[in-house]
A protein has these predicted regions:
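Helix-terminus/linker motif at the lipid-water interface of multi-pass membrane proteins
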Residues: 24-42, 111-120, 176-185, 244-277, ...
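Short runs within selected transmembrane alpha-helices of multi-pass transporters and secretion channels
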Residues: 62, 132-151, 159-167, 188-203, ...
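N-terminal transmembrane alpha-helices
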Residues: 3-31, 35-36, 52-64, 68, ...
Length: 443
C-alpha cells in the first residue's frame, strides 16, 4: 500500500487546518468591513467573486503541476518532479503578473461591465478593494505553486504554517488599519494584500530550501521548458477552463443577485462566507486525493487509486455531516455577527439552512469526487460536465427560480443545488464505470 492510514492523516489534517485558516481570512475581512455598513460589505463581496475567479484559475494551474509532480514521484523520478515544479512556478508567475496588469489598468470599466446596476456607494467600495488586492496576485501565484509542490510530496504542513502567518498578518493589519487608522475598505484590502505578499515570499524561500525533498536549487530550472509546461497545461488548461467558466457563471449569478438590492447582495455574500466553513473537511480531502491518486497512477496502482478514493470520500461525508448539522441550528446566531439589516439577516438564515440540508447528501460527490478524476488525467470529462452543468443548471435554474418565479436569492441558491445534483450524478457514473482510470500517467 502506498499510503497508510497514518500517512493519509498526516496529509489531510494540515490541509483541513490550512483550509480553515484560508476561510478565516475571508470571514475576518467580512466581519471587519461590516462595521462600515452594507454598502462596504456588498462592494467587497462583489470583488471577492472576481478574485475567486483569478484564484480558481491559479488553483487549476497549480493542480496541473501537483498532478505531474505526484506522478513523477510515484515513478521515483525526483529530478523530473523538481523540474516540473519549477516550471509550475514560472507559469503561475507569468499568469499572475498579466492578471495584475489587466485588473489594475481596467478596474472601474471591468466592474461596471460585470456589476453595472449596483449602487454608486457599492461601486466605489468595490473599485478601491479590487485595485489594492489585485496588486498581490503575483505573490498569491508564488504561494499556490509552492503549496502544490509541497503537497505533491505529501507535505501539507508547510502551506498550513504559512496560512497561520497569513492570518496573523491579516488580523493584525485589520486591527491597525480598520480600527486604529479607520481606513475601512482600504484597510481590509491592504491587510489582505500584505498577508499574500508575505506568504508568497516565504513559500518561495522554502521551495528552494533544503527542507524540500524536490527542492529547486538552481535558476536553470525556471527557464521555460515546453516539454514540462505542456504536461502541466494538459491538466491545468482544462481545469482552468472549468474553474474559470464556473466562476464566470457564478459572477453572472451574483450580477443577478445584485439586481435584487443591497440587502440581498450582502446576505448572499455572508452566506458564501459561512458555508465555506461547512465545506472545509470535504474540500481538504479533495486536495489530498490529488496527491494520493496522482502518486498511485504514477506507480501504476490503479486499484489503490480507486480504493483510496472510496475511503477518503467516506471520510469527507463524515466531516460534512459534522459541520453542517451544528451550522443548521446556529444559523441565526452566526448571521447576527455581521451587523446586517433585519431583511438581510432573515435572507441569510434561510439560505444557510437550505444549504446545510442539501450539502449533507451531495456536496462531496459534486466536488470531492472530481479531484481523483483530475489526478488520473481525466480532466476533459470533468471540464465538460462542470461547464455544461454550470450554464444549463446553475445559471439557467437561478434565472428561472430567482427571477421568473420571484424567489430572489433563495431561487439562486436552489439553482446552485440543482447544479450540484447534476454534477454528482455525472461524476458517480464516471467513477463506477472505471473509464477515469484509462487515461494513464503523464509522467
Amino acid at each position: 500500500m502506498l499510503f497508510s492510514g497514518k500517512d493519509l492523516r498526516k496529509l489531510i489534517i494540515p490541509l483541513m487546518f490550512e483550509q480553515l485558516l484560508a476561510v478565516l481570512v475571508g470571514l475576518v475581512d467580512t466581519l471587519m468591513v461590516s462595521q462600515s455598513g452594507e454598502a462596504a460589505v456588498a462592494g467587497v463581496a462583489l470583488v471577492d467573486n472576481i478574485n475567486r475567479l483569478i484564484i480558481q484559475v491559479m488553483a487549476a494551474l497549480a493542480t496541473g503541476g501537483a498532478v505531474v509532480c505526484s506522478q513523477y514521484i510515484g515513478k521515483g523520478r525526483d529530478d523530473e518532479s523538481r523540474k516540473s515544479g519549477a516550471q509550475l512556478e514560472t507559469v503561475l508567475l507569468i499568469f499572475s503578473v498579466i492578471m495584475t496588469a489587466f485588473s489594475v489598468s481596467f478596474t472601474r470599466p471591468l466592474l461596471k461591465l460585470i456589476f453595472g446596476t449596483v449602487e454608486e456607494s457599492v461601486m466605489d467600495c468595490a473599485v478601491l478593494y479590487f485595485m489594492i488586492t489585485a496588486l498581490s496576485y503575483p505573490f498569491l501565484g508564488m504561494y499556490n505553486a509552492g503549496a502544490a509542490i509541497f503537497r505533491s510530496v505529501g507535505n501539507s504542513k508547510v502551506s498550513m504554517n504559512i496560512s497561520i502567518l497569513m492570518n496573523v498578518i491579516n488580523v493584525a493589519g485589520n486591527a491597525l488599519f480598520v480600527f486604529v487608522f479607520k481606513w475601512s475598505v482600504a484597510g481590509v484590502a491592504l491587510s489582505t494584500a500584505l498577508s499574500r505578499v508575505s506568504a508568497g515570499i516565504v513559500m518561495s524561500v522554502l521551495v528552494c530550501g533544503k527542507t524540500n525533498p524536490v527542492r529547486i536549487d538552481h535558476v536553470k530550472y525556471f527557464v521555460p521548458d515546453w516539454n514540462y509546461i505542456k504536461k502541466i497545461l494538459t491538466i491545468g488548461i482544462p481545469s482552468g477552463i472549468e474553474n474559470g467558466m464556473f466562476q464566470i457563471g457564478k459572477l453572472m449569478v451574483v450580477s443577478m443577485v445584485a439586481t435584487f438590492g443591497t440587502a440581498s447582495t450582502a446576505a448572499n455574500s455572508v452566506g458564501y462566507t459561512v458555508i465555506d466553513f461547512a465545506n472545509i473537511p470535504a474540500a481538504s480531502m479533495g486536495l489530498a486525493l490529488i496527491t494520493v491518486v496522482g502518486q498511485c497512477i504514477g506507480a501504476g496502482e490503479k486499484a489503490q487509486a480507486k480504493m483510496y478514493t472510496k475511503k477518503v470520500l467516506w471520510w469527507s461525508y463524515i466531516g460534512d455531516w459534522a459541520c453542517n448539522i451544528p451550522l443548521f441550528f446556529m444559523a441565526g446566531f452566526i448571521a447576527s455577527w455581521f451587523h446586517l439589516s433585519a431583511e438581510a439577516t432573515q435572507i441569510t438564515v434561510t439560505i444557510l439552512r437550505c444549504f446545510n440540508v442539501v450539502s449533507l447528501f451531495i456536496w462531496p460527490l459534486s466536488f470531492t469526487l472530481s479531484n481523483p478524476l483530475r489526478a488520473s488525467g481525466d480532466v476533459k470529462y470533468t471540464m465538460t460536465v462542470s461547464i455544461i452543468s454550470m450554464w444549463l443548471f446553475r445559471v439557467g435554474s437561478s434565472y428561472i427560480f430567482g427571477v421568473v418565479l420571484g424567489l430572489g436569492v433563495l431561487g439562486v441558491w436552489i439553482g446552485m443545488f440543482v447544479d450540484w445534483a447534476a454534477r454528482s450524478a455525472c461524476f458517480v457514473i464516471r467513477f463506477i464505470s472505471g473509464k477515469w482510470l484509462e487515461r494513464g500517467s503523464l509522467a
